[in-house]
């Protein structure tokens, strides 16, 4: 039964597809065709009688099927019936010829009239352009694509390549002129007189140009789960018949665009973007056009060879760049690379072939320990054992490197060629086209780059949350490409000024670029992360060049540098190379170049002056703020008192950047792993990349003196391989860097092995960390600690216990011992307690015997000597200095705990034997009997683990506490570990909300002072931030409890707004509120003044008597006082849902379904293009997580809506009408422009 049902469904789908194809065939016939009755050869194109209506019907079919049903059946049928090549292009070219002729005649004869029915033909031309945009829209397949789209993807891609060739070649690309003519009709209109439809026509023309440039051969990989077969497939298999790569290359596009004046049109729009045009309509299409123009172009190849003086690169593309101008086609360039490869292979064959005895073969057999034999042929193996072993290695099966899932760009719905300009597989131009392209780029930078970058930056700043992967990559690579191009241009052209890309240094641009990089890294969107690294690297290069040029206006530079090296950004930049070894060669290259630029810029600034940045300050012990300081700041800055206090006690301060500290962030094993993995592929690298690797190795080995990080076998073998005859070319400029470093590296390694023979074993394993052995291994000396300057940790304190004052001292002491002992037991510190109990028992015996001897001798007042306490075994004495809970227990027993590392811990002889006996018994008790906390939480919930700003062994923080000061545990500036600084008012109110349930249970919280809400200021001082520091004039007992952020652990202590809010938590209070609502409802929301006074007495009496009322309130309630239960029952029934709403909703739903049925029976299709479904075109975000899948759907709908708006808004209409249409379960109002001539 199910098989029959499935077969029936398939037959129905085939029948509907057959009907659809028949409709498209009829439309293709009715549009028009060659006029064979004409005597002209070839016959001219003749329009059909209903040509305009047919074109509009075709647009409706695209929206109805392809957009709304996520199918590409219409696009496939249109391609098979050759509507674009046989109908649309001839119509547009014929229209362009007529308009051009009319313009020439009008120029010679001003009285000449336009050709007949021009308005009608203009409508046809505009509809043809709309269809061209729909049919050439780049196709992208993602995880959300339907099976129909995946099936048709390959064939449609080939059809689009035919479209591109035909558009560029038919009458030398005259259809491009036709599109420009449509745009010129809009440009002639004054800006204030243009309608949104006119602006959409401009956007439509730009999208047509964008589509022509963006069309490329289909990808082999659709996504990580669905792949096209790759065996035996070459780039030719993705091309349709009679189409070569030269026909659709960027070289051909540039030639056609230059001939048809597209470059001039684009320059006109970009240079006048903010003056003559509505930039919100055309800024993104212009960005996309410039992105697709440049994404495959290597900037260095656009400049003369003299730019790289003395360069001998290993990359074949580089070696051939000097002859690029002589290459006419891309096929010729491929041939030159193959010839170069053949020449290199022939040299290697000759080098390893015997000259005189090659005809007499040699055979060498090697027996392995497991009795197997390995055979090597060739007489060379008899001469050199290294060659024999190398031949064995070469005979091993080579496992091709598998690209990880996160490295697949196609899996994110993006074309694989996004980063081609960085791979060396750049496109080459003929000499004339290269000159035209370079001239266009220069003119664009001189006149429009700053304007366009400013426009799109402002747009994306407001829309950043809606930016999808493709938009982020386009923006970042557009930014990076033009900045790098201008830097290269300025080196050889004195007229080129860095100020022509000055918008790249603006504050908003820097914030957007850095935020895109940060968010992409956090979301593990590695494609955007890669693009962000490229853009950030070029930004740093621009900063460095501007600094070297010593520009007068350096405000933007100082702003960038002051924020560039904040702790958070340094952490991000140093994390990027740590993950680089997991990804592609180009990703690692970007990591290395970014690291090189970061260290270079920071070192450049640190050499000139002390680099000061904005960073988080440590909390000071006291703030010396006077009333005069506050008044002066209020007058100077025109701010209120709260904001002045916020500025004076700001938690941000200027700090000096220690270059050595920043450099140390990069001295880690993962970073070294990335550099070595990158260098292993040295045959694919340029000299400049190899030089940067060894520059970093020099930093590690010499400047940072972290030699242990580079003492590795893989690096030793790699250096040997690079310097071997088969390694780097002897003429390579980078070989000398490798040779010099290798000599120094091996010399230091020999010394280290002689000094510390343990390194013979250490080379075999990763270096050790955080231990005395590891320290000695790395630095060759013992890790001697300066005990004089190391302070012990403050002991834990007890939180306030409910009803503490009412408890007897013995019960309170018992609880404290129970809390501390059970906390240590929970942490698995039984051995600490055993040794402590053993010492107490031993001390008791000594004290008792001492007392017995002295009483007999009449010396009762003499105290016994102090008993020193040390831990034995593997524990060392660290817990006595560092364990806060253990130190608290020692303090509770009576021990004198050390404040510094070199001080002893002892039990004074002044301790009473009775007290020590009680302590011993209590420790024994809770070692054997579990302690049950009254609140049901772990014992540690009663402890407050305080710490000072000068915690552990830190010496650089400023908290005002000196080593000779006593601990002041009541000082609010000794901060509890489990408290953090509330980051916003929202977090503060969330904390208060969490307090409510606890306060109903009777939990007590510390009190604080509520400050007024800060006013939201648009312009605040740089470095300003909110703070909870004390206000001026606060007394010691009024200081608010300070909290501190520490590792993202949220606080369990909260601050209340008032000391009197405990009454508000009384259930009687809420019952009184219920009575008040009942009275207001009964009296229509109004009460007399007498009744308000009566109710106040009534509420106060209930609060004082626990809900009991003794007075007479019949006049207030109009009878007896109702019970609270009856009032609540009345309220709950009055709030029940109204059944009439349900019936009304059912009625509306039934009316909507009837309306939909009537619409479906009507065969007339609407010409509205708004709110259509996604066509999965032009990008999608990565489907690796739910957020990105949602983003992909949003962008897909956004792209379809954008494309449809362009088509519908451009429709010419004689009358405008409004239609309301209901779609499915959503009621959407759609404004439709009808055409009177349908």
UniProtKB/Swiss-Prot annotation:
Task: Tell me the protein's name.
Answer: Topoisomerase 1-associated factor 1
Q: Name one GO molecular function term.
A: DNA binding
Q: Which GO terms describe its cellular component?
A: cytosol; nuclear replication fork; nucleus; replication fork protection complex
The record's subunit annotation is: Component of the fork protection complex (FPC) consisting of TOF1 and CSM3. Interacts with WSS1 and ESC4.
InterPro entries per record: Timeless, Timeless_N
Q: Which domain of life is it from?
A: Eukaryota
- Where does it localize? Nucleus
Indicate, by first and last residue, each region the UniProt record lists as having compositional bias (Basic and acidic residues): 1038-1050, 1195-1205
Q: Which organism is it from?
A: Saccharomyces cerevisiae (strain ATCC 204508 / S288c) (Baker's yeast)
- Please tell me whether the keyword Oxidoreductase is annotated for this protein: no
Q: Which protein family is named in the record? A: Belongs to the timeless family.
| Polar residues bias locations | 1173-1194
Q: What else is known?
A: Present with 952 molecules/cell in log phase SD medium.
Region (Disordered) residue ranges read 1008-1051, 1159-1218
Q: Where is the composition biased (Acidic residues)?
A: 1209-1218
**Function description:** Forms a fork protection complex (FPC) with CSM3 and which is required for chromosome segregation during meiosis and DNA damage repair. FPC coordinates leading and lagging strand synthesis and moves with the replication fork. FPC stabilizes replication forks in a configuration that is recognized by replication checkpoint sensors and protects stalled replication forks against the fork-releasing activity of RRM3 helicase.
Instruction: Say yes or no: keyword DNA damage present.
Output: yes
Compositionally biased tracts (Basic residues): 1010-1023
Which keywords annotate this record? Cell cycle, DNA damage, DNA repair, DNA replication inhibitor, Meiosis, Nucleus, Phosphoprotein
Which sequence positions carry the modification called Phosphoserine?
A: 626, 654, 1056, 1058, 1213
In its UniProt record, which GO terms are filed under biological process?
DNA repair; DNA replication; DNA replication checkpoint signaling; maintenance of DNA repeat elements; meiotic cell cycle; mitotic sister chromatid cohesion; replication fork arrest; replication fork processing
């Amino acid at each position: 039964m199910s098989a029959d049902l499935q077969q029936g469904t398939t037959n129905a789908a085939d029948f509907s597809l057959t009907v659809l194809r028949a409709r498209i065939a009829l439309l293709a016939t009715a549009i028009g065709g060659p006029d064979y009755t004409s005597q002209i050869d070839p016959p001219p194109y003749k329009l059909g009688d209903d040509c305009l209506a047919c074109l509009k019907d075709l647009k409706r079919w695209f929206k109805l099927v392809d957009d709304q049903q996520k199918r590409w059946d219409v696009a496939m049928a249109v391609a098979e019936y050759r509507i674009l090549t046989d109908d649309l292009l001839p119509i547009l070219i014929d229209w362009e010829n007529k308009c051009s002729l009319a313009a020439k005649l009008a120029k010679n004869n001003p009285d000449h009239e336009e050709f007949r029915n021009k308005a009608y033909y203009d409508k046809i031309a505009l509809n043809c352009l709309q269809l061209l945009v729909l049919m050439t829209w780049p196709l992208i397949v993602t995880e959300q694509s339907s099976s129909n789209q995946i099936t048709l993807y390959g064939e449609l891609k080939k059809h689009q390549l035919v479209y591109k060739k035909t558009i560029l070649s038919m009458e030398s690309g005259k259809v491009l002129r036709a599109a420009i003519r449509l745009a010129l009709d809009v440009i002639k209109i004054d800006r204030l007189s243009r309608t949104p439809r006119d602006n959409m026509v401009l956007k439509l023309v730009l999208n047509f140009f964008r589509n022509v440039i963006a069309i490329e051969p289909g990808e082999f990989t659709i996504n990580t789960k669905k792949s096209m077969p790759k065996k035996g497939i070459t780039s030719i298999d993705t091309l349709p018949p009679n189409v070569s790569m030269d026909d659709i290359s960027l070289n051909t596009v540039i030639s056609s665009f230059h001939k048809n004046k597209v470059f001039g049109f684009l320059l006109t729009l970009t240079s006048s973007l903010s003056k003559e045009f509505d930039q919100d309509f055309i800024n993104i299409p212009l960005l996309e056009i410039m992105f697709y123009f440049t994404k495959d172009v290597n900037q260095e190849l656009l400049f003369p060879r003299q730019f790289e003086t003395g360069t001998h690169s290993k990359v074949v593309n580089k070696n051939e760049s000097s002859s690029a101008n002589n290459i006419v086609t891309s096929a010729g360039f491929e041939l030159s690379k193959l010839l170069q490869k053949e020449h290199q292979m022939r040299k290697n064959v000759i080098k390893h072939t015997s000259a005189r005895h090659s005809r007499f073969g040699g055979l060498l057999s090697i027996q392995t320990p497991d009795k197997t034999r390995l055979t090597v042929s060739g007489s060379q193996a008899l001469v050199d054992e290294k060659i024999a072993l190398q031949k064995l290695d070469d005979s091993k099966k080579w496992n091709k490197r598998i690209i990880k899932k996160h490295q697949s760009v196609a899996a994110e719905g993006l074309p694989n060629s996004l980063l081609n300009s960085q791979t060396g597989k750049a496109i080459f131009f003929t000499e004339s086209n290269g000159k035209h392209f370079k001239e266009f780029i220069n003119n664009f930078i001189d006149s429009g780059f700053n304007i366009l970058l400013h426009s799109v930056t402002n747009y994306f700043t407001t829309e950043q949350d809606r930016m999808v992967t493709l938009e982020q990559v386009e923006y970042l690579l557009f930014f990076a490409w033009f900045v790098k191009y201008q830097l290269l241009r300025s080196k050889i052209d004195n007229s080129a000024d860095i100020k022509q890309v000055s918008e790249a240094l603006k504050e908003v641009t820097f914030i957007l670029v850095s935020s895109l990089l940060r968010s992409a890294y956090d979301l593990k969107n590695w494609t955007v992360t890669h693009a962000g690294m490229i853009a950030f690297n070029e930004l740093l290069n621009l900063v460095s060049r501007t600094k070297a040029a010593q520009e007068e206006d350096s405000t933007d530079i100082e702003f960038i540098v002051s924020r560039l090296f904040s702790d958070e950004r340094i952490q991000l930049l140093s994390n990027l190379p740590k993950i680089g070894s997991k990804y592609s060669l180009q990703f690692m290259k970007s990591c290395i170049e970014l690291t090189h630029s970061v260290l270079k810029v920071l070192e450049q600034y640190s050499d000139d002056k002390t680099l000061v940045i904005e960073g988080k300050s440590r909390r000071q012990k006291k703030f010396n703020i006077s009333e005069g300081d506050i008044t002066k700041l209020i007058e100077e800055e025109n701010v209120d008192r709260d904001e002045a206090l916020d500025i004076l006690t700001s938690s941000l301060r200027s700090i000096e950047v220690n270059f050595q500290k920043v450099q140390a962030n990069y001295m880690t094993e993962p970073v070294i792993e990335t550099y070595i993995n990158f260098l292993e592929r040295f045959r694919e690298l340029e000299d400049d990349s190899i030089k940067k690797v060894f520059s970093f190795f020099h930093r590690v080995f010499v400047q940072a003196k972290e030699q242990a990080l580079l003492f590795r076998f893989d690096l030793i073998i790699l250096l040997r391989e690079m310097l071997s005859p088969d390694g780097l070319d002897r003429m390579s400029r980078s070989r000398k860097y490798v040779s010099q470093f290798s000599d120094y590296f091996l010399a230091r390694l020999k010394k280290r092995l002689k000094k510390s023979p343990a390194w013979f074993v250490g080379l075999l394993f990763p270096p050790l960390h955080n231990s005395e052995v590891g320290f000695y291994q790395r630095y060759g000396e013992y890790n001697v600690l300066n005990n004089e300057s190391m302070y012990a940790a403050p002991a834990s304190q007890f939180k306030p216990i409910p009803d503490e004052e009412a408890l007897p001292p013995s019960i309170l002491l018992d609880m404290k011992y129970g809390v501390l002992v059970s906390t240590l037991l929970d942490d698995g510190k039984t051995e600490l307690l055993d040794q402590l109990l053993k010492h107490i028992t031993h001390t008791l015996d000594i004290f008792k015997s001492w007392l017995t001897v002295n009483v007999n001798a009449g010396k009762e007042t003499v105290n016994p000597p102090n008993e020193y306490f040390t831990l034995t075994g593997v524990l060392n004495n660290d817990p006595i200095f560092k364990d806060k809970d253990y130190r608290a227990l020692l303090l509770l027993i009576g021990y004198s705990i050390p404040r510094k590392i070199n001080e002893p811990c002892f039990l004074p002889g002044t301790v009473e034997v009775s007290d020590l006996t009680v302590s011993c018994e209590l420790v024994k008790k809770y070692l054997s009997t579990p302690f049950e906390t009254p609140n049901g939480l772990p014992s540690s919930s009663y402890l407050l683990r305080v710490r000072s700003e000068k915690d552990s062994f830190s010496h650089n923080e400023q908290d005002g506490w000196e080593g000779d000061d006593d601990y002041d545990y009541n000082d609010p500036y000794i901060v509890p570990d489990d408290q953090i600084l509330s980051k916003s008012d929202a977090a503060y109110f969330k904390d208060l909300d969490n307090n409510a349930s606890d306060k109903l249970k009777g939990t007590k919280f510390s009190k604080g002072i509520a400050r007024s809400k800060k006013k939201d200021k648009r312009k605040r001082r740089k470095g300003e931030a909110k703070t909870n520091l004390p206000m001026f004039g606060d007394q010691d007992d009024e200081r608010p409890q300070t909290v501190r952020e520490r590792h993202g652990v949220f606080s369990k202590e909260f601050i209340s707004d008032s000391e009197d809010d405990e009454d508000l938590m009384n259930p009687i209070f809420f019952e009184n509120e219920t009575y008040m609502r009942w009275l207001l409802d009964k009296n229509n929301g109004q009460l007399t003044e007498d009744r308000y006074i009566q109710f106040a007495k009534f509420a106060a009496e209930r609060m004082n008597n626990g809900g009991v009322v003794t007075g007479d309130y019949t006049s207030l309630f109009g009878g007896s006082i109702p019970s609270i239960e009856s009032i609540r029952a009345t309220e709950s029934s009055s709030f029940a849902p109204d059944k009439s709403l349900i019936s009304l909703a059912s009625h509306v739903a039934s009316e909507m379904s009837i309306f939909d049925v009537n619409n479906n029976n009507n065969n007339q299709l609407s010409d509205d293009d708004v709110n259509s479904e996604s066509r999965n075109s032009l990008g999608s975000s990565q489907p690796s997580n739910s957020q990105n899948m949602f983003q992909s759907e949003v962008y897909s709908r956004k792209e379809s809506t954008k494309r449809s708006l362009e088509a519908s808004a451009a429709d010419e209409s004689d009358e405008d009408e409004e239609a309301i249409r209901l779609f499915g379960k959503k009621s959407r109002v759609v404004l439709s422009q009808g055409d009177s001539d349908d």
